[in-house]
């Protein structure tokens, strides 16, 4: 194979099994080819079930696997602080607009249609609770505690 000069994993590394991803990159990159990765990685675990720990690769495991598969880390850049304003704005938007609209809708439906509201609440309450728990994912302080948004440039070593 060895057809490509560059493979770009832009916010997709977390969906690829670590070793399998590096094996495929080895197969498809030309000698001296590059693997450019931009994604968030877990660097701290505290034994909790925080949602930040679920959908990211462990940073050290990822870097160790890269080395083990013959990739040299050429450059790395911690992009975390540059991405936090997006999370902060998302949280602001939900707190300022979405939550008040939902609260008013719930209040109004309970006041005007109590029986219907009770049935609907019973049906969707667990799903809403699950989604509310995911709001920790846009808490920039929680993100900083567990993850780093990293950009890595690897080069396939000539073997």
What are these regions (language model features)?
Residues 49-141:
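Substrate-binding/catalytic lobe of Class I Rossmann-like enzymes that use SAM or dcSAM, i.e.
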Residues 10-13, 38:
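Residues lining the SAM
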Residues 32-40, 44:
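Conserved beta-strand signature within the Rossmann-like core of class I S-adenosyl-L-methionine
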Residues 15-16, 44:
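Catalytic P-loop NTPase motifs of RecA-like helicase/translocase cores
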Residues 19-34:
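A short glycine-rich, Lys/Arg-flanked "PGG" loop and its adjoining helix->strand segment in the class I
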Residues 1-7:
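A short acidic, Gly/Pro-enriched loop at the edge of an enzyme's catalytic core
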Residues 145-152:
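Short hydrophobic/aromatic beta-strand or adjacent loop that forms the aromatic wall/cage
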Residues 154-157:
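Active-site beta-strand termini and strand-to-loop segments that position acidic
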């Amino acid at each position: 194979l060895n057809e490509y000069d560059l493979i770009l994993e832009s916010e997709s590394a977390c969906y690829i099994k670590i070793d399998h991803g590096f094996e495929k990159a080895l197969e498809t990159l030309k000698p001296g080819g590059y693997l450019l990765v931009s994604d968030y990685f877990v660097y701290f675990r505290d034994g909790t079930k925080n949602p930040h720990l679920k959908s990211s690769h462990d940073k050290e495991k990822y870097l160790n696997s890269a080395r083990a598969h013959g990739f040299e880390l050429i450059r790395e850049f911690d992009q975390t602080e540059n991405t936090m304003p997006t999370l902060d704005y998302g949280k602001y938007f939900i707190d300022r607009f979405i939550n008040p609209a939902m609260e008013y809708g719930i209040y109004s439906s309970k006041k005007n249609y109590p029986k219907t509201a009770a049935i609907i609440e019973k049906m969707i309450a667990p799903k809403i609770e699950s989604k509310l728990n995911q709001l920790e994912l846009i808490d920039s302080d929680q993100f900083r505690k567990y993850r780093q948004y990293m950009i890595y440039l690897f080069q396939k070593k000539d073997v």
